From Swiss-Prot:
The keyword Transmembrane does not apply. It comes from Nitrosomonas europaea (strain ATCC 19718 / CIP 103999 / KCTC 2705 / NBRC 14298). The gene is pepA. One of its GO terms (cellular component) is cytoplasm. This is Probable cytosol aminopeptidase. It catalyses: Release of an N-terminal amino acid, Xaa-|-Yaa-, in which Xaa is preferably Leu, but may be other amino acids including Pro although not Arg or Lys, and Yaa may be Pro. Amino acid amides and methyl esters are also readily hydrolyzed, but rates on arylamides are exceedingly low; Release of an N-terminal amino acid, preferentially leucine, but not glutamic or aspartic acids.
């Protein structure tokens, strides 16, 4: 999909459809008022007659209005003007693109982004509009013999911005929105693939291809390399599967050679049956999404590379399956991690932290400025926070705040959970340095406490995306989160330099 910024008045737009808004008081927006004048009061009469009362997310499609060059006019209800905030704006934009899909319109003039959204500016409106436009066109039907349903026809979106003083900020927002949307698509495509296709070896192949596309440095550790290094925790998870584990590293060098990199470490369990601690059968198919952290690293690096950010970023992806089998790790087994710490594996379904602890220890050799791990780590985080926000914890408060702010900026929000020393008590083992699980209480926190034991040598934060990486039910599929948060985090860091 192509995007462009238009600075002329809406009545001059000649495309297939033009979109303007109406508030619940039956008040036309400024763009709608200008169109109404060109159409000799036609829009005003429609509104006065009650065909469009302005209730949020109601739509009315009009055709062939005399005096208006566009073939169609889509009126979209904005709700009460005094309540027009972030969520309402985002819902309205989603509704707009959904309403456009069956029209056959190929190019659209959108005059919603100059509306006043509480606490936001026009650039934010544009960035979100671009992301939502691309999201509305997303389809994942590559595994079907025949694509179902009508394919999206919309090819171009012209975003109306009459205030030319915002032109530079708006153009930047447009490019950032496109890069984020492209990164989210990469993340969703990887997540939505069937687990018999998206294996650790497949991810390694995709990483190598991505490295060629964006001139990244690619390397991969095979199981024999991990054995030589002493990655006993990662290998313990892989033992039940015939698919070999991998540890993938992608390096983006956009900053100075002297600048330390930001490291993103993404959990890549391409299918998690739980191992010997077998999961219930219900919804086990969704455990293909347990590589959402890894997928988000792919997506974020895509966005960073497209934007050519002046920053150094390293993506570290430990990837394996977690399956039962005759050679699988058993509850009670004790393994030695890369850090030298021994771990009593009380539950083989607490596997994400096992592969991450070795990946985090491995990341030390890159002397990172900061490290952020991203993982669909715990059901406990979903219980605590639902599917609205991700959980964030860490050993460095400024870093945690950077991530929280990036989430607020992009509306890909996170919530700060505590990491108090008292929680560490739950991880005591009678037979090893640490156990891989605690009690049933505070599970998202104790999982992060476990990881914190392998992050003593760098500034670190942990994003638990178990509730935000995918949707269940009728709209089942990967969400592309937290690519917006991570990309904004890196944009902000690059801007500081």
């Amino acid at each position: 999909m192509d995007f462009a910024i238009r600075s002329d008045n809406p009545e001059k737009y000649r495309g297939d459809c033009i979109v303007v808004g109406v508030f619940e008081s039956r008040k036309l927006t400024e763009a709608a008022r200008v169109l109404d004048e060109a159409g000799k009061g036609h829009l005003g009469r429609i509104v006065d007659q009650g065909d469009m009362d302005g209730r949020a997310n109601t739509t009315l499609l009009l055709h062939g209005i005399s005096g208006i060059d566009s073939k169609r006019v889509l009126l979209i209800g904005l709700g009460k003007e005094e309540e027009f905030g972030e969520k309402v704006f985002l819902d309205v934009v989603r509704t707009t693109f959904k309403a456009l899909q069956p029209t056959g319109a190929k190019d659209v003039g959108l005059y919603l982004t100059e509306l006043t959204v509480k606490g936001r500016d026009v650039a934010w409106n544009v960035l979100q509009t671009v992301i939502l436009a691309e999201e509305s066109a997303y389809r994942f039907d590559r595994l079907k013999s025949k694509p179902e349903g009508r394919q999206p026809s919309l090819a171009k979106v012209d975003i109306g911005i009459t205030d030319t003083s915002t032109a530079a900020a708006v153009e930047t927002a447009l490019q950032q929105g496109l890069a984020i949307a492209h990164g989210m698509k990469v993340t969703k495509d990887l997540g939505n693939l069937a687990p018999n296709i998206c294996t650790p070896s497949y991810l390694a192949g995709q990483a190598e291809e991505m490295a060629r596309t964006f001139n990244l440095k690619f390397s991969v550790l095979e199981e024999k390399d991990m054995e030589e290094l002493g990655m006993g925790a990662l290998l313990a998870v892989a033992r039940g599967s015939h698919q070999p584990a991998k540890l993938i590293v992608l390096e983006y060098h956009g900053g100075k050679d002297s600048e330390k990199p930001v490291a993103l470490v993404g959990k890549g369990v391409t299918f998690d049956a739980g191992g010997i601690s077998l999961k219930p059968a219900a919804e086990m198919d969704e455990m293909k999404y347990d590589m959402g952290g890894a997928a988000s690293v792919f997506g974020t690096l895509t966005a960073v590379a497209e934007l050519k950010l002046p920053i150094n970023v390293i993506g570290v992806i430990p990837t394996t399956e977690n399956l039962p089998g005759g050679n699988a790790t058993k509850p009670g087994d004790v393994v030695t991690s890369l850090s030298g710490q021994t771990i009593e594996i009380l539950n083989t379904d607490a596997e994400g932290r096992l592969i991450l602890c070795d990946a985090l220890a491995y990341t030390e050799r890159y002397d990172p400025e900061v490290v952020v791990d991203i993982a669909t780590l715990t059901g406990a985080c979903v219980v605590a926070l639902g599917h609205v926000v991700s959980g964030v914890m860490g050993n460095d408060e400024p870093l945690v705040q950077e991530l929280l702010q990036a989430g607020e900026q992009t509306y890909d929000r996170a919530w700060h959970l505590p990491l108090f020393d008292e929680y560490q008590e739950q991880l005591k083992s009678n037979f090893a340095d640490t156990a891989n699980i605690g009690s049933r209480w505070g599970g998202a926190i104790t999982a992060a406490c476990f990881l914190s034991r392998f992050t003593k040598k760098f500034r670190w934060a942990h994003l638990d995306i178990a509730g935000t990486a995918w949707k269940s039910g009728k709209e089942k599929g990967a969400t592309g989160r937290p690519v917006p948060l991570l990309t904004q985090f890196l944009i902000s860091r690059a801007n500081k330099h």
